[in-house]
Amino acid sequence: MSGPVVVLAGGTGGAKLARGMLDVVGSDSLVVIANTADDIEIYGAYVSPDTDLVTFWLTDRIDERGWGIAGDTFHVMDGLRAIHVDVWFNLGDQDLAIGLERARRLQEGERLTEAHTAISKALNAPATVLPMCDEPVRTRVRTQDRWWPFQEYMIRAGGAAAGGDPVQDVDFRGARTARPTPEVLHAIAAAQAIVIGPSNPVISIAPILAVNGMRQALTDATARIIAVSPLVAEAVVKGPTAAFMEFAGLPVSNDGIAAYYDGLIDGLVADRRTHGLPALETDVLMDTPTARRRVAEETLGFALALR
C-alpha cells in the first residue's frame, strides 16, 4: 500500500480505532491527527488529553478506566490536596510528568507538534500522532449562565450527559487564526485513505475541522474520506455525544452523523444503514482487540473500494 492511513481522532472512540488500525497497517503507515481543543494548562503542566489518549492506546499504556496510564499513582494530587489546592482535574504522576515536559518544551520555543513528537519518541509510540495545529484552539461551552472552558464544563459543571446545565452554544476559540501544520497537510495530501474516528462529532471532530484550512485540505485530498459512526444500535455507548448532537439540531442516529459530515465524507461505517450515502453495515462496537482490528480492517477496505 502507498501513502499513510490518516485517522482523525478525539476521545476514546477515535483512539480505539487508531489502535485497531495500527494492527492492520503497521507503524509506518498510520498517522493520527488529534484534537487539541481540549488542551488545558494546569498545575504548571500543559495537558493534551486527546493527543495523549491516542498515544497511550498506541503504546498499550491505557488504563482500564479509559483514560490515564495503567498502574499510575496519584501522589502529587494527594500532596496538592494536603496543602488545600483545589484538585478538580485529576492527573496521575506519570501523566503529569508528560504534561510538565510538554510545558517545558513549549516554554523553550518548540512547536506543539515538536513537543509531542519528542514525547512520543520517548514513549516508543509505534505510529505518528500529530496535533491538529500548533496554535492554541480551545473549546468553550455556553450554558444559561456563562461560557465554560470545555474541561471545566465537563468536570466541574457536570456536563450535559451527567445532568449538568444544558448546552446553549459551543465555539472553538482561536480556530479561525490557526492553521494545519505542515506535517498535517503533508499527511492528508499523501494519504491513501482518511478515516474520521467514531468520536463525538460536535466536540471532538468539529474542532479539527474548524481549523482554518483543514476542511479545504481534506476536500482537496485524493483519498476517500470515511467516517465511522460513534453510535451502536442508534445509541451512544458512553459520554456526552447525544447531548451535543441534540444541541446541534441533529437526530441521535446514523442519519444524523451522515448529515453532520455531509459534503465532506464519501461513506459511513455503521451498524445500521443510512440513506443517500455509501455505507458499510457492520458491528462498530470496539470492546476487544479483535473487534478493533476488524472494524479498522473493514473500514480501510471500504475506503479503498470506493476509489
Q: What is the meaning of each model-derived region?
A:
Residues 16-29:
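A short, Lys/Arg-enriched amphipathic alpha-helix followed by its capping loop at the start of a domain
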Residues 191-192:
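An anion/phosphate-binding loop that grips the pyrophosphate of nucleotide cofactors and donors
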Residues 1-6:
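Extreme N-terminal starter segment of soluble prokaryotic enzymes
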Residues 237-307:
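C-terminal functional extensions of proteins
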Residues 207-215:
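Charged helix-capping and loop-helix junction motifs
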Residues 34-172:
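Electropositive, gly/pro-rich neighborhoods at or near active sites that engage anionic ligands
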Residues 168-188:
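Active-site glycine-rich loop that binds ribose-phosphate moieties when present
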